[in-house]
Design a protein with these regions (language model features):
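Anion-binding alpha/beta catalytic cores of soluble intermediary-metabolism enzymes, centered on
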Residues: 1-208
Length: 208
């Protein structure tokens, strides 16, 4: 009998292993890199998860990863709106987080309405995109270029990469699963590790 895991994702498991609550999941491919703020699968709980501190935390995490792991010296980050029209969350929470990040030196813009942002290909002007909840970014991500995509865990001391696929437990032990996404994740992990080591070497012993 198959024993189902007690963790909702490998990211949650790794967070316990590394002893951290400050983590996030990034989806990345050649077209776009994106993550999201509200770590809940329930739409009814999304709005209360959107706080200024939560948005700022994701901006910092994505900025750090883009610099350390993806070789972006001055990352440009876009932040999406929660609603289809500008409401209280955009005015009182997301905009404040964006402005505070700007005042701290981050190159960040938003909030953008997600429909027009993706329809007009605005994402091509940015190194990373932060959505407010998972489905807001995963749908466009898959539509743009799902092949050769990875899921990358931000905020961990080690490089943690997996294929950007849903786990198909019904395919276990049937020898029918496509292996190329796993190979892509392994190659991506190697590239990310190399870039992080280069970043560490370039930034150590800097003059104050």
């Amino acid at each position: 009998r198959m024993v189902m895991p007690e963790f909702k994702s490998h990211t949650a498991y790794l967070a316990k292993v590394f002893g951290t609550t400050q983590h996030s999941e990034m989806y990345a491919n050649e077209a776009i890199r994106t993550c999201y703020v509200a770590d809940t699968p329930f739409v009814s709980q999304v709005a209360k998860s959107i706080t200024k501190d939560a948005v700022l935390e994701k901006i910092v995490a994505m900025n750090d990863s883009l610099r350390m792991d993806f070789g972006c010296t001055k990352p440009k980050i876009a932040v999406l709106a929660l609603n289809s029209e500008f409401g209280d969350e955009e005015k009182n929470t997301i905009s404040q987080a964006v402005e505070e990040a700007k005042s701290s030196g981050f190159i960040v813009s938003g909030p953008f309405l997600s429909e027009t942002f993706f329809d007009a290909a605005e994402y091509t002007r940015f190194d990373g995109v932060i959505g407010m909840y998972r489905d807001q970014v995963v749908g466009p991500f898959k539509a743009l270029a799902f092949d050769n995509s990875i899921s990358y865990s931000l905020g961990f001391p080690k490089i943690c990469v997996s294929p950007a696929l849903t786990v198909n437990y019904d395919q276990v032990d049937k020898n029918i699963t496509e292996e190329s996404p796993l190979a892509m994740a392994i190659f991506a992990a190697s590239d990310l590790l190399e870039k992080r080591e280069q970043y560490t070497e370039l930034t150590k012993n800097q003059l104050k």
